[in-house]
Amino acid sequence: MVKRLVVTAGEPAGIGPDLVLALSKEHWPHQLVVCADKKMLAQRAEQLGINVTLLDYDASTAPSPQQAGTLVVEHIDMPSTCVAGQLNEENGHYVLKTLERAALGCMKSEFDAIVTGPVHKGVINRAGVAFSGHTEFFAELSNTPLVVMMLATEGLRVALVTTHIPLAYVSKAVTAERLQKIIDILHRDLVEKFAIAEPKIYVCGLNPHAGEDGCLGREEIETITPTLEKIRQEKGIHLLGPLPADTIFNEKYLNDADAVLGMYHDQVLPVLKYKGFGQSVNITLGLPFIRTSVDHGTALDLAGTGQANTGSFRTALQHAIELVEKKQ
């Protein structure tokens, strides 16, 4: 059965529109609907020398596979002109409107998944909206109390206990309650969305050497280890850890792990991006819909040049399609 996926082009001055237009050259097995300003896409296509037919989205028609050389567009009006590579605060609210339209469409089953292009947090905040990222935006919009940020590339999945908070706040944020909820969501979605019957989750410690018996910090002793033991006993989830972050990423562990759970953003993401930059995908777990995204930013210096690497966007789209097809 043909499904309908919605794609947000992201920050209009960045490479998001370039990526969407580049992939319009190809055939895809499901319908792709792009939430963006149609005129902006037409202008960028001309700038890039891409010959594409922009079609108006009609929700009343049945979805059909994406045909090469075409792009179905749900037009969201952009209030100000856009120059590739130049941020414009007047378009900050426009970006959020594209995200809102896509998410609400998924929540009412109009769309089967969201694939998001990169946004610029700074320009949205300067437009007067407190915005810390897609993950938090979709969680609030869908009234989801807690979501899990996971990134994946070939041979490695990493998830986070905390996301976009200052490093100084991480220790207090890693509570037994939060850790248990994060593991519940991660385990459930590995089973339900990734079709892994008995997931093996490997858990990082917070401190160097996982605290080294309390000499380098007591979070492992007081919070992480007791919580993992409780979850193992009560729910039978396969958990290994806490393990030192500087040793968990070796073949001995990774060959057996379905996911690695890190305590904070820069503990695990540098490893994943080193392993698969340009070929990795951001997946939000715990939402009432499937959401994948690129693993990079807006790359303003590349916008409109035709030099943007489509690898991560392609991976995000392929992952979304795989997850949608597993639901069938």
From Swiss-Prot:
EC number(s) reported in the record: 1.1.1.262
Top-level taxonomic group: Bacteria
Binding site for a divalent metal cation: 164, 209, 265
Residues reported to bind substrate: 134-135, 273, 282, 291
InterPro entries registered for this protein in UniProt: PdxA (IPR037510), PdxA_fam (IPR005255)
Pathway(s) served: Cofactor biosynthesis; pyridoxine 5'-phosphate biosynthesis; pyridoxine 5'-phosphate from D-erythrose 4-phosphate: step 4/5
Record flagged with keyword Transport: no
Molecular function terms, GO-annotated: 4-hydroxythreonine-4-phosphate dehydrogenase activity; cobalt ion binding; magnesium ion binding; NAD binding; zinc ion binding
Gene3D superfamilies given in the database record: Isopropylmalate Dehydrogenase
Keyword DNA-binding carried by entry: no
Pfam families: PdxA (PF04166)
Subunit structure: Homodimer.
Described purpose of this protein according to its UniProt entry: Catalyzes the NAD(P)-dependent oxidation of 4-(phosphooxy)-L-threonine (HTP) into 2-amino-3-oxo-4-(phosphooxy)butyric acid which spontaneously decarboxylates to form 3-amino-2-oxopropyl phosphate (AHAP).
Note: The active site is located at the dimer interface.
Family: Belongs to the PdxA family.
PANTHER family: 4-HYDROXYTHREONINE-4-PHOSPHATE DEHYDROGENASE
HAMAP family for the chain: PdxA (MF_00536)
Protein name: 4-hydroxythreonine-4-phosphate dehydrogenase
Lineage, opening ranks: Bacteria, Pseudomonadati, Pseudomonadota, Gammaproteobacteria, Vibrionales
Record gene name: pdxA
